[in-house]
């Protein structure tokens, strides 16, 4: 996933340690139980917080966020982190931001300043930005947006997209394997 390279760097540094709480789509059968990929990469998962959303009405989302705050707070009190790293803009990430803010644990927000037009995600992402002490954005435009939200420029760092490192460090699949996996045969010209 997007955080795997960062987690590898932290794991290699003897002065640092990290605790990993996995929730959301990582635990979803529909999304392929991707927490198993985390385990396959030899990362210890300190806790799994299973949160099921039962509908998409405002009251369902409020229940989900409330449950997430309650469960994440319980784990944070137990783990006592010095810093919380958050990537994303989903309900559970927003909930983790609320918990960290209330427990006065600094938040390091990754990929802030981005825009998802026509989606509520922007509101959650920008709220997480406002709760955060450190900001690691993917480009200068997003740095400008985080700055416009009133954040200290000294705490905003342009580091590029985490997906780029993931792609650069991925093993490429052969053309033949793609054809086999997708049950197709590439022609001279192909349209994706």
Feature map (PLM): residue ranges:
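Short coil/turn segments at beta-strand junctions that form active-site/ligand-binding loops
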Residues: 16, 82, 188-190
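Active-site and donor-binding regions of nucleotide-sugar-utilizing enzymes
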Residues: 1-11, 48-153
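Structural beta-sheet core signal
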Residues: 19-22, 86, 109, 158
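A generic N-terminal leader/anchor concept
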Residues: 11-17
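Conserved nucleotide-sugar phosphate-binding/catalytic loop shared by glycosyltransferases and other
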Residues: 17-64
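PLP-dependent amino-acid enzyme catalytic core
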Residues: 13, 47, 59-79, 158, ...
């Amino acid at each position: 996933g997007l955080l795997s390279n960062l987690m590898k760097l932290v794991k290699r540094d003897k002065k640092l340690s990290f605790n990993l709480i996995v929730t959301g789509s990582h635990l979803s059968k529909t999304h392929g139980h991707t927490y198993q990929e985390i385990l396959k990469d030899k990362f210890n998962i300190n806790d799994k917080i299973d949160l099921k959303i039962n509908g998409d009405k405002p009251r369902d989302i409020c229940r989900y966020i409330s449950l997430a705050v309650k469960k994440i707070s319980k784990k944070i009190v137990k783990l006592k982190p010095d810093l919380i790293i958050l990537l994303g803009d989903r309900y559970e990430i927003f909930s983790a931001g609320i918990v960290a803010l209330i427990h006065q644990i600094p938040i390091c927000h990754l990929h802030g300043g981005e825009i998802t037009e026509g989606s509520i995600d922007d509101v959650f992402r920008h709220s997480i930005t406002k709760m955060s002490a450190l900001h690691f954005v993917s480009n200068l435009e997003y740095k400008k947006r985080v700055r416009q939200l009133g954040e200290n420029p000294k705490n905003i760092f342009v580091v590029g997209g985490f997906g780029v490192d993931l792609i650069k460090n991925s093993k490429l699949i052969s053309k033949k394997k793609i054809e086999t996996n997708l049950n197709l045969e590439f022609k001279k010209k192909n349209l994706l």
